[in-house]
């Protein structure tokens, strides 16, 4: 289902087929092709790989679960309700079983994943 971004978009994660990506199972809710200002993904994280984005900033909102996130040389705690801003260039990965909503600015993040492990 695709809707023109100049009007509005509505997507239900339950209606989007997931696929495996660097962080886990991703469901794109607002995609690059939607031509919105950002991309939004619903992600089930499990065994994420350390990576960075050269051109994309990410905002993670933790919906469910708990764990940690490695950001360059730091590690922070994660649990439901926490928001994390990850600027482009920062090496990062989430550790634990988490359900997150990621907002990626600008769009095009799936072409900007640089895995380090």
Task: Please state what every model-predicted region is.
Residues 88-113:
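Ligand-binding loop in jelly-roll beta-barrel domains
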């Amino acid at each position: 289902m695709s809707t023109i971004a100049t009007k509005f978009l509505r997507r239900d994660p339950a209606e989007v087929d997931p696929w495996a990506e660097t962080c886990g199972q991703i469901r794109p809710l607002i995609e690059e092709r939607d031509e919105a200002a950002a991309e939004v993904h619903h992600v089930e994280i499990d065994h994420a790989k350390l990576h960075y984005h050269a051109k994309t900033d990410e905002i993670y909102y933790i919906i469910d679960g708990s764990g940690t996130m490695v950001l360059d040389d730091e590690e922070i705690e994660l649990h439901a309700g926490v928001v994390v801003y990850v600027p482009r260039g920062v090496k990062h990965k989430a550790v634990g079983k988490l359900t997150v909503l990621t907002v990626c600015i600008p769009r095009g993040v799936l072409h900007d994943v640089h895995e380090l492990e």
